[in-house]
From Swiss-Prot:
This is Bifunctional protein HldE. It comes from Pseudomonas paraeruginosa (strain DSM 24068 / PA7) (Pseudomonas aeruginosa (strain PA7)). It comes from the Bacteria. The gene is hldE. Pfam families: CTP_transf_like, PfkB. Pathway: Nucleotide-sugar biosynthesis; ADP-L-glycero-beta-D-manno-heptose biosynthesis; ADP-L-glycero-beta-D-manno-heptose from D-glycero-beta-D-manno-heptose 7-phosphate: step 1/4; Nucleotide-sugar biosynthesis; ADP-L-glycero-beta-D-manno-heptose biosynthesis; ADP-L-glycero-beta-D-manno-heptose from D-glycero-beta-D-manno-heptose 7-phosphate: step 3/4. The active site is at 263. Homodimer. GO terms for biological process: ADP-L-glycero-beta-D-manno-heptose biosynthetic process. In the N-terminal section; belongs to the carbohydrate kinase PfkB family.
Amino acid sequence: MKLSMPRFDQAPVLVVGDVMLDRYWHGATSRISPEAPVPVVRVEQHEDRPGGAANVALNIAALGAQALLVGVTGRDEAADSLANSLKAAGVDARFQRIDSQPTIVKLRVMSRHQQLLRVDFEEPFRTDAAALALDVEALLDQVKVLVLSDYGKGALQNHQVLIQAARARNIPVLADPKGKDFAIYRGASLITPNLSEFETIVGRCADEAELVAKGQALMSELELGALLVTRGEHGMTLLRHGQPALHLPARAREVFDVTGAGDTVISTLAAALAAGEELPSAVGLANLAAGIVVGKLGTAAISAPELRRAVQREQGSERGVLGLEQLLLAIEDARAHGEKIVFTNGCFDILHAGHVTYLEQARAQGDRLIVGVNDDASVTRLKGAGRPINSVDRRMAVLAGLGAVDWVVSFAEDTPERLLEQVRPDVLVKGGDYGVEQVVGAQIVKAYGGEVRVLGLVENSSTTAIVEKIRQKG
């Protein structure tokens, strides 16, 4: 599946549901309590993070999309903490505050990255469903997708009113369902149960074929547009009417904590759909996002750069021939990992041993080597009629096959100055017997603090000489 990064800045999403505060107490554990056989934790740090529907909205904002949130809280310190965190993250939160009930808080006691205890402070909210529906309807014209983030805590009382209001405006409705009655989500564009939630409704599935059959039946019964079953280490399965099932393998490299993974899936889906992605592509992006977030500790959001890097890995753009946009993203990823970027350029019309030795020496100047290649028209201007011998596509393909070369990109100008201004390498390398100041682009690189290095030429290695020898023998 071909994936690309959507324009999340053009993706307004409204999230409605059960907001909660995820509170973490971190501390050291070195002894057992004399009062009971339990560890004593000396609390050294505490942090609050938005949870539930608030985490969905936070994830949407972290991707660079516009997140609006409607939910229910108490009128207390936890609600204030939630509101402040969401505002700082760029989420437009509208809370229905209830004096008589506390904000839902999930307190986790942590030591050495392990969860020792979770304490829940909650009671189901007695929501003013009519007032909440009015708040939602007032915002629907501002968004492209509606998300129902349902944790069964009472914020969502009349799902059908919200679903029908969105459908009347041709706004897709995504629901993360809970409970034993999925009929309340009838008419939704997509629901995203995990496997356990799905099997609670349809019964145990012995294999994928049975999962698909039961899923298709559920879609028809509830008039759903699509169904996405998240299956942990087995990935995800997307079902659509009249289409074959789409099975996506899990993409997690390491799994530390699955807390909030479902929130990440539906938030990425919503943001991608709001940005104009087709459903299969949006699911592919959500699958990558889930693989990232389970590698983090606790309730966490992923950023657009993190997802962008995952897309690059998925599309194999860690190495090889890249367009300029892809290259700039790959450089951003490399710099995020502290890697030094080296750049060199040339025509590389007929690759020979001298080129290979030179490129290996250039690669040794840093961590990543970019080779800028003159396109065919510029080679003709520089070398004369009859050149290049090989087209730019072939020249770049050969260079990309060398172990020393990370990325290859072409440029149309006679010199690489314009490309250097965009790439901004840490080190500019050229081969020759001249001084640093004579290197084309040296002033550009040195102006922003980069280095320029000149490597010696390999003797008896010249493309021009090779071409002349071929012509003499031809």
